[in-house]
């Protein structure tokens, strides 16, 4: 799963048992990346 650190803005890959912490700066707030899929919605 891909996350982005809220402090240093780097992409972080987390393992299941690695803990929730940025390996670069040690910050504990990680933001989940949004999917890049485009969704179509029909409007009536």
Curated annotation (Swiss-Prot):
Disulfide bonds: none annotated. DNA-dependent RNA polymerase (RNAP) catalyzes the transcription of DNA into RNA using the four ribonucleoside triphosphates as substrates. NCBIfam families: PRK00398.1-3 (NF001606). The keyword Zinc applies. Binds 1 zinc ion. Keywords: Cytoplasm, DNA-directed RNA polymerase, Metal-binding, Nucleotidyltransferase, Transcription, Transferase, Zinc. Pfam families: Zn_ribbon_RPAB4. One of its GO terms (cellular component) is cytoplasm. Its EC number is 2.7.7.6. InterPro entries: RNAP_P/RPABC4, RPABC4/Spt4, Rpo12. The lineage of its organism: Archaea, Methanobacteriati, Methanobacteriota, Stenosarchaea group, Halobacteria. Part of the RNA polymerase complex. One of its GO terms (biological process) is DNA-templated transcription. This is DNA-directed RNA polymerase subunit Rpo12. Zn(2+) binds at residues 8, 22, 25. Signal peptide: none annotated. It is found in: Cytoplasm.
């Amino acid at each position: 799963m891909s996350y982005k650190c809220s402090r240093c803005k780097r992409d972080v890959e987390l393992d299941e048992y690695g803990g929730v912490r940025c390996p670069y700066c040690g910050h504990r707030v990680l933001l989940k990346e949004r999917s890049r899929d485009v969704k179509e919605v029909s409007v009536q």
